[in-house]
């Protein structure tokens, strides 16, 4: 497992454990939102298409501004999952080669508390 994947596994474990410790329902499906960014809109769009083909629902890209004023484009890819560490990590492992292919940065994932 690459260092990046070890870091994403550790972060995923922490997020899932914190949600469950706060009382989030382990039996429900959650909208897992994966976040992406790239300064090249065309490359970002190509990654979004590939992620859609891989089974993720993708949002429209948004343009934002970095601290130095440079533009950056962002979007999310969402999929319904239980709060299962192995499943979420497997999704990340599936996405990383697509992102590397297009030079898109992965900015982690999140979801919302559910009782």
UniProtKB/Swiss-Prot annotation:
InterPro entries: RraB, RraB-like_sf, RraB_dom. GO terms for molecular function: endoribonuclease inhibitor activity; enzyme binding. The keyword Iron does not apply. It comes from the Bacteria. The keyword Cytoplasm applies. One of its GO terms (cellular component) is cytoplasm. Keywords: Cytoplasm. Pfam families: RraB (PF06877). It is found in: Cytoplasm. Its main location: cytoplasm. HAMAP family: RraB (MF_01888). Belongs to the RraB family. Interacts with the C-terminal region of Rne. Globally modulates RNA abundance by binding to RNase E (Rne) and regulating its endonucleolytic activity. Can modulate Rne action in a substrate-dependent manner by altering the composition of the degradosome. This is Regulator of ribonuclease activity B. The lineage of its organism: Bacteria, Pseudomonadati, Pseudomonadota, Gammaproteobacteria, Aeromonadales.
């Amino acid at each position: 497992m690459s260092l990046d994947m070890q870091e994403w596994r550790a972060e995923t474990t922490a997020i899932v454990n914190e949600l469950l410790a706060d009382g989030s329902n382990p039996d429900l499906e959650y909208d897992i939102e994966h976040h992406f960014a790239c300064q090249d809109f065309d490359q970002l769009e190509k990654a979004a298409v590939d992620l859609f083909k891989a089974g993720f629902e993708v949002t429209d890209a948004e343009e934002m501004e970095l601290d130095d004023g440079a533009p950056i484009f962002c979007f999310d890819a969402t999929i319904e999952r239980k709060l299962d560490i192995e499943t979420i990590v497997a999704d990340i492992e599936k996405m990383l080669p697509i992102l590397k292919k297009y030079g898109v940065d992965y900015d982690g994932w999140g979801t919302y508390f559910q009782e």
